[in-house]
C-alpha cells in the first residue's frame, strides 16, 4: 500500500488527468501540471512523485528541458518516481483482427518502454521497473524508478565529532599551525627557547639545537620562513640536533 503522506502528483493538461486531479485533491494530495512544474521552483522534497500523462510522452524524452532530471532534484534519497502513461490502442478497432497488427502494437509499446527506461537510467535513477497492462481504451505503461542515495556517507560525515578526526590524515597534520603566543604563560615558549648556549671565545658562540621544539615546522628554515615571534629569530637555518655557530664580529 502506497503512503501518500509525502507525495506530489504531476499531471498533463488533458481530460482524463483532470479527473485524476480531482480525486487526488479530495485526498488532500498536492497536484501540479507538467507545464507549471517545468516553470516553477518547488521548495520541498518528496518521498513519492507520481507523473500521469494521456497519449503524450514525448516531453519525457526532451533533452533540452529534462523533466526527469528536475523531478530527481525534488525527490528524497531513495524516493520513488512513478510514471503512468495512458496510450490509445489504435490497432484495437473493428477492422483490426490480424496477428500482424497485434504484433506491431506490442513492438511499439516495447520500444516506448525501452526508451523511457534508458532515459531514467541516463538521469541516474536505479531499480527501474516497467510494466504494461491493457485497459478498456488502450495500453497503460507504468515505470517506477528510485532516486539513489550514493552520497549518504558524504552528507552524514560532514561534521567532525572529535579532535582526533581533524588530524586523521597526514596531509591535514602538515597544514595545522600551532604557534607559540607572544605572551605565553603555559611554559611552551620557554620550552621552545631551550637552546644550550656555549661560548667558544669572544668572537664565536655555539648553540646546541638538540632540544629545539618547532610547532610550525618553519623554525629550522631560516628567518625568511619564521614568524615575527619566533624564538629562533636571528639564527641561520639549521637541522634539529645540529650545533649552530655564530660569528659575533659579523654585523
From Swiss-Prot:
GO terms for cellular component: mitochondrial intermembrane space. Keywords: 2Fe-2S, 4Fe-4S, Cytoplasm, Iron, Iron-sulfur, Metal-binding, Mitochondrion. InterPro entries: Anamorsin (IPR007785), CIAPIN1 (IPR046408). Residues 155-167 are annotated as: Linker. GO terms for molecular function: 2 iron, 2 sulfur cluster binding; 4 iron, 4 sulfur cluster binding; electron transfer activity; metal ion binding. It is found in: Cytoplasm; Mitochondrion intermembrane space. A motif (Cx2C motif 2) lies at residues 227-230. A motif (Cx2C motif 1) lies at residues 216-219. GO terms for biological process: iron-sulfur cluster assembly. Residues 216-230 are annotated as: Fe-S binding site B. Pfam families: CIAPIN1 (PF05093). [4Fe-4S] cluster binds at residues 216, 219, 227, 230. Residues 1-154 are annotated as: N-terminal SAM-like domain. [2Fe-2S] cluster binds at residues 170, 181, 184, 186. Residues 170-186 are annotated as: Fe-S binding site A. Its cofactor is [2Fe-2S] cluster; [4Fe-4S] cluster. PANTHER family: ANAMORSIN. Component of the cytosolic iron-sulfur (Fe-S) protein assembly (CIA) machinery. Required for the maturation of extramitochondrial Fe-S proteins. Part of an electron transfer chain functioning in an early step of cytosolic Fe-S biogenesis, facilitating the de novo assembly of a [4Fe-4S] cluster on the cytosolic Fe-S scaffold complex. Electrons are transferred from NADPH via a FAD- and FMN-containing diflavin oxidoreductase. Belongs to the anamorsin family. The C-terminal domain binds 2 Fe-S clusters but is otherwise mostly in an intrinsically disordered conformation. Monomer. This is Anamorsin homolog.
